[in-house]
């Protein structure tokens, strides 16, 4: 989980969100014996993939020892799309090749990138569909070049006042 999400979870139980507490939580989670029963892969964040456990090995090593495959979220978030202020473009391509090489060395074997689309009568626009598809394609090519598997997530948000048929039509466009 991201540092922000982890902070919310820890603060909800009155635990300070320090790097040490986040590490202890993750280490406990990833070393649970039941993890091997149903978790085939774990998507990590930059902080997590670089953390060293209290037993002096990195979190990806712990995940691998438990029989799962470590992966990494590599996009840097969705920002407002130029010329379409109501839509988003996912960023993170700058410097991605170097980050992917580092993540592979740290144990990642797959990656995740999310493109977000909102549904309205006008959206997603052709511009948003094309821009995010282009970014997803570039991301995928770089990941494969670095010997990892890309997870491509074009996420069409279902929020809003539209019918299921409109949602299906917009999702099909994407």
PLM regions: where:
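Structured alpha-helical segments in the cores of large, soluble enzyme domains
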Residues: 93-110, 132-148, 173-174
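Positively charged, low-complexity, intrinsically disordered RNA-binding extensions
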Residues: 150, 159-164
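Conserved, mostly hydrophobic/aromatic
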Residues: 18, 113, 152
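Conserved radical SAM core fold
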Residues: 77-81, 116-123, 157-161
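Alpha/beta catalytic barrel-like cores
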Residues: 1-106, 119
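Glycine-rich, histidine-containing beta strand-loop boundary motifs that form or position
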Residues: 1, 114-115, 154
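Short, electropositive alpha-helical surface patch
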Residues: 125-134, 163-174
């Amino acid at each position: 989980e991201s540092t922000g999400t982890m902070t919310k979870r820890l603060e909800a139980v009155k635990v300070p969100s320090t790097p040490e507490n986040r590490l202890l939580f993750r280490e406990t989670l990833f070393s649970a014996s039941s993890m091997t029963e149903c978790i085939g892969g774990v998507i990590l964040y930059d902080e997590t993939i670089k953390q060293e456990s209290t037993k002096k090995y990195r979190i990806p090593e712990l995940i691998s020892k438990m029989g799962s495959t470590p992966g990494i979220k590599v996009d840097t978030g969705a920002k407002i799309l130029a010329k379409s202020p109501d839509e988003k473009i996912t960023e993170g391509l700058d410097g991605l090749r170097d980050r992917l090489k580092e993540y592979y060395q740290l144990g990642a074997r797959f990656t995740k990138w999310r493109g977000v689309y909102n549904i309205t009568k006008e959206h997603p626009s052709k511009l948003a569909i094309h821009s995010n598809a282009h970014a997803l394609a570039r991301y995928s090519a770089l990941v494969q070049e670095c010997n990892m598997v890309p997870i491509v997530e074009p996420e069409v948000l279902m929020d809003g006042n539209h019918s299921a048929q409109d949602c299906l039509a917009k999702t099909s466009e994407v």
